[in-house]
Amino acid sequence: METIFAQSSAFGKAGVAVFRISGPKSLEVLQLLTGRKDFKPRLMYYQQIIVPETNELIDNAMVVYFKLPNSFTGEDVVEIHTHGSKAISIMLINTLLNIADIRLAEAGEFTKRAFLNNKFDLTAAEGIADLINAETIMQHRQAVRQANGGLKELYNKWRNQLLKIISLLEAYIDFPDEDIPESILNDVNNTHKNIVNEISNYLNDNRRGELLNNGLKLAIIGPPNTGKSSLLNFLMQRNIAIVSNIAGTTRDIIEGHLDIGGYPIILQDTAGIRTESTDIIEQEGIKRAINSAKTANIKIVMFDAEKLDSSINNDITGLIDENTIVIINKIDLIEPNKTFAIENRYKCLRVSVKNNIALSNILKNIENIAENLAGVTETPYITNQRHRHYLKQALSHLIDFNLDNDLVLATEDIRMTVRCIGLITGVINVEEILNEIFKNFCIGK
């Protein structure tokens, strides 16, 4: 296995820069860079880092050596902590590149080596990637659970139950003259039924994990000039949309990303929806607004309190569902006791974006809907499409399983199910099935 290195911290100006080296020559490289031989594992040393050919000082650094297998990758690993200077990083990288039999690591190669050395399964590796990319508290919680084996436990439970079924059935395939006892048939059928139900329910999750990973799309829609762009600017805490009294100012979709209650929200301000527009560009903007709302996870439908009754149309109300927040804006311009017919149909929030009246209620409602759609629960979620794809394949094989038909074909359906789950976790091993058989049956006795 080659020795690899990379700067693990971001390149650029910072307090500290961290370099990682992994592979059989790691300790030798550290000794070459420092001129010191007596490094003990897991102890941090303050050392000068030099260019071996010239003895030029690169930096005074903290270094540590991890002896295999007690390291992140399971190999010999060295970490070098220098000052976070671009010049230092360039000098150290060039120095490492000039050392024989060491190369720059490929993207994700340290984690890949950790997986290959059985430090964790593929779901945990994906959890580490999600943890690095997490931008909100809820994304972090989901990623931490996955990185610490939350999904592995669930998938391995199903896999072990299926291996048990295979071991039972394989024994009777090898000894066809013996009838399968009724108790074993019942155990197999009950286990099969339970796994089918569990995977079916697990897949029927409304893609909560993927929503949390990728962000919940929130579309702000409504008639023209109701304050949609002002609301977007308020939520984003900066002016990213042009605000004007002229109807139709917003033509295209304006997008922003924010964190509300720990949930990642992708905000979209859209063109005002009205039926009487003759402007071709505005008509295209209205079309895009409606399409945006149809694909949104959360919708805010916004009306102007002064023009509410005359601005309601079916294009707008037809988009309202259980994940919609209906807002009556500019309440500072009407009498406090004025009521609207739409309030009899929907729960409405009365606000004034301009004068910051009741805007916290909007944030709370967004958070409540986001929690309902993607809130973290005790059961780990499916977090990406790869898992969902193989679980659907696994379920298909389980549904095909039938002990009333050929026993070999039935066993193959279970074996294919195990393979699909193994493709998720990265564990596919025929020896496990053999071990299960020999553990439970006294073959040849």
UniProtKB/Swiss-Prot annotation:
Highest taxon in the source lineage: Bacteria
Enzyme class: hydrolase
Cellular compartments annotated: Cytoplasm
Co-factor note (free text): Binds 1 potassium ion per subunit.
Residues reported to bind GTP: 225-230, 244-250, 269-272
Residues spanning the signal sequence: none
Cofactor needs: K(+)
Main location: cytoplasm
Enzyme Commission number, as recorded: 3.6.-.-
Tagged with keyword tRNA processing: yes
Residue ranges annotated for the TrmE-type G domain, each copy included: 215-371
GO cellular component term of the entry, any: cytoplasm
UniProt: K(+) binding residues: N225, S244, I246, T249
Keyword terms, alphabetized: Cytoplasm, GTP-binding, Hydrolase, Magnesium, Metal-binding, Nucleotide-binding, Potassium, tRNA processing
GO annotation terms (biological process): tRNA methylation; tRNA wobble uridine modification
Residue numbers binding Mg(2+): S229, T250
Pfam families referenced in this protein's UniProt entry, alphabetically: MMR_HSR1, MnmE_helical, TrmE_N
GO MF, any single term: GTPase activity
CDD domains to which the protein is assigned, alphabetical: trmE (cd04164), TrmE_N (cd14858)
Chain sites annotated for binding (6S)-5-formyl-5,6,7,8-tetrahydrofolate: R20, E79, K119, K445
Self-association state and partner proteins as the record states: Homodimer. Heterotetramer of two MnmE and two MnmG subunits.
NCBIfam families: mnmE_trmE_thdF, PRK05291.1-3, small_GTP
Family annotation (HAMAP family): GTPase_MnmE (MF_00379)
Role noted for this protein: Exhibits a very high intrinsic GTPase hydrolysis rate. Involved in the addition of a carboxymethylaminomethyl (cmnm) group at the wobble position (U34) of certain tRNAs, forming tRNA-cmnm(5)s(2)U34.
Family affiliation: Belongs to the TRAFAC class TrmE-Era-EngA-EngB-Septin-like GTPase superfamily. TrmE GTPase family.
The protein, known as: tRNA modification GTPase MnmE
Species of the source: Rickettsia prowazekii (strain Madrid E)
